[in-house]
């Protein structure tokens, strides 16, 4: 029981249990946040705070000071993490946290360890020429997308809080400053391994690998070859994650190796977006000039990133280099099969199939080709198909998803024939489909509207409304029906920006 006196201690909301700070100091740079002028708490994620075992009462009182960096909580060991990375294929040997500061780690009520990190908390030794700050728009975007991904069931970092700083930040224009508090299973990236490998720091790579196994994959400690098993486990999680991205039409936008976690969580939502009209070549990010990270390219980029991780682990996988390369290549080749298995399993679920038949892949591909040819909305097409799967399957919306409504007839006939051989009941199938086909996603135009109102008018009502809708993405919410609709032509977001 926390006494009233203890609650009144500044920053007593956290019970930090820091492990990364115990690694050799070349892994990070100690760095306190830089205080800001007038912090104001926009949003505190109280359910998440409770899951993390934090004192919500203290956070309500001191949250503006803590989450802005003005008050460093007791037990925190603030630091900026070192890492490298391939950015759009080009290697940068030193990147690191240029505007993010890890306050420390807490152990949640589920017994799992989590990082608490402030983004936009000031300059660090890795800032290069940056100011270490964040603008309000990108902070709100990351809050919205993080929590939407959680509600959709996609592994991702979480949003604990957002604050304004009362200070301007200078980009192409002057914008209000803000700080985002991110929660992650960890912030260890492929680029973290690359940082040490690029320096020939074999002991650094080994220490990091041991730490990752201990923190994220403790079951591998007894494996015959723990480091080869680690590479395989990371590959499995990444294949599953990217398959889930494709199932919901998510486009990360900047899949650099410094933006790929070894924990299997989605991280860094700067230019990310959700596809409206289905087109596998869709790109939103303003800096992805050649479509490297387009929707359909994401699985292959995941494999490319894993190859970069494998390169760093070769000396640990086997002392004989040729043998190490063979073992790593086997994992990289298997990634494609892993991804395809996860993707097809999820797509079967999206069209209501419980059993497996050889023709299922072609049936899925035929639907996607029809959607592309007919300019169909990705999210609503699958949701409306769910409405056709039940006993009361008279819902006409599916056909209207297509420019030529009659164009869907042939595919629907094939689909119904396939359903007739599937073991599920109609009611069970419809319920299962609705549990994997969302009705609400963070539509890009809705996200931009919420950001614009907050930045230009200090009006956070659209931000709050969007969070409320997206908290239940698989449920029909008649009072928020407008949020399910695709953008009108004049509302379409054609480009997204990193915002850093």
From Swiss-Prot:
ATP binds at residues 96, 98-99, 119, 131-132, 182, 189, 268. The active site is at residue 258. Its EC number is 2.7.7.-, 2.7.7.108. Its cofactor is Mg(2+); Mn(2+). It catalyses: L-seryl-[protein] + ATP = 3-O-(5'-adenylyl)-L-seryl-[protein] + diphosphate; L-threonyl-[protein] + ATP = 3-O-(5'-adenylyl)-L-threonyl-[protein] + diphosphate; L-tyrosyl-[protein] + ATP = O-(5'-adenylyl)-L-tyrosyl-[protein] + diphosphate; L-histidyl-[protein] + UTP = N(tele)-(5'-uridylyl)-L-histidyl-[protein] + diphosphate. Keywords: ATP-binding, Magnesium, Manganese, Metal-binding, Nucleotide-binding, Nucleotidyltransferase, Transferase. It is an enzyme of class 2 (transferase). It holds the Pfam family SelO. It comes from the Bacteria. PANTHER family: PROTEIN ADENYLYLTRANSFERASE SELO, MITOCHONDRIAL. Belongs to the SELO family. Nucleotidyltransferase involved in the post-translational modification of proteins. It can catalyze the addition of adenosine monophosphate (AMP) or uridine monophosphate (UMP) to a protein, resulting in modifications known as AMPylation and UMPylation. This is Protein nucleotidyltransferase YdiU. It comes from Rhizobium etli (strain ATCC 51251 / DSM 11541 / JCM 21823 / NBRC 15573 / CFN 42). The gene is ydiU.
């Amino acid at each position: 029981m926390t006494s009233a006196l203890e609650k009144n201690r500044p920053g007593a909301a956290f019970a930090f249990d820091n492990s990364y700070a115990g690694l050799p100091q070349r892994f990070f740079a100690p760095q306190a946040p830089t205080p800001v002028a007038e912090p104001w708490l926009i949003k505190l994620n109280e359910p998440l705070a409770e899951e993390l075992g934090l004192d919500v009462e203290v956070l309500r009182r001191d949250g503006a000071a803590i989450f802005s960096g003005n008050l460093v909580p007791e037990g925190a060991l603030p630091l900026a993490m070192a890492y490298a990375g391939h950015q759009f294929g080009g290697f940068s040997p030193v990147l690191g946290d240029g505007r993010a500061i890890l306050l420390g780690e807490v152990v949640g009520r589920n017994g799992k360890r989590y990082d608490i990190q402030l983004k936009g908390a000031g300059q660090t030794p890795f800032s290069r020429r940056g100011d270490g700050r964040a603008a309000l728009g990108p902070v709100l975007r990351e809050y919205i997308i993080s929590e939407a991904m959680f509600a959709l069931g996609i592994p991702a970092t979480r949003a604990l809080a957002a604050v304004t700083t009362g200070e301007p930040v200078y980009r192409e224009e002057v914008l209000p400053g803000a700080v985002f508090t991110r929660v992650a299973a960890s912030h260890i990236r492929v680029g973290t391994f690359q940082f040490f490998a690029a320096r020939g720091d074999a002991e650094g790579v080994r220490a990091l690998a041991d730490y990752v196994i201990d923190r994220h994959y403790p079951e591998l400690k007894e494996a015959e070859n723990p480091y080869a098993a680690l590479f395989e486990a990371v590959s499995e999680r990444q294949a599953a994650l990217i398959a889930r991205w494709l199932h919901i039409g998510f486009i990360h936008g900047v899949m650099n190796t410094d933006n790929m976690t070894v924990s299997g969580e989605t991280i860094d939502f700067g230019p990310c977006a959700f596809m409206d009209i289905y087109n596998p070549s869709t790109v939103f990010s303003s800096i992805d000039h050649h479509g490297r990270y387009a929707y359909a390219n994401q699985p292959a980029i995941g494999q490319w990133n894993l190859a970069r991780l494998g390169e760093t682990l070769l000396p640990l996988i086997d002392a004989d280099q040729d043998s190490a390369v063979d073992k790593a290549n086997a994992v990289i080749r298997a990634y494609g099969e892993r991804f395809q298995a996860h993707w097809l399993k999820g797509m079967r679920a999206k069209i209501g199939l419980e059993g497996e038949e050889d023709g299922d892949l072609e049936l899925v591909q035929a639907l996607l080709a029809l959607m592309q040819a007919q300019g169909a909305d990705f999210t609503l097409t699958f949701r409306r198909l769910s409405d056709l799967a039940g006993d009361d399957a008279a819902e006409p919306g599916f056909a209207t998803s297509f420019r030529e409504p009659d164009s869907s007839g042939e595919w629907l006939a094939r689909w119904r024939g396939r359903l007739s051989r599937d073991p599920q009941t109609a009611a069970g199938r419809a319920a299962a489909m609705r549990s994997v086909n969302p009705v609400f996603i963070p539509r890009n135009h809705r996200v931009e509207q919420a950001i614009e109102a907050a930045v230009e008018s200090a009006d956070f009502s659209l931000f709050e409304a969007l969070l409320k809708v997206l908290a239940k993405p698989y449920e029909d919410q008649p009072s928020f029906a407008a949020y399910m609709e695709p953008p009108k032509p004049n509302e379409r977001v054609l480009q997204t920006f990193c915002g850093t």
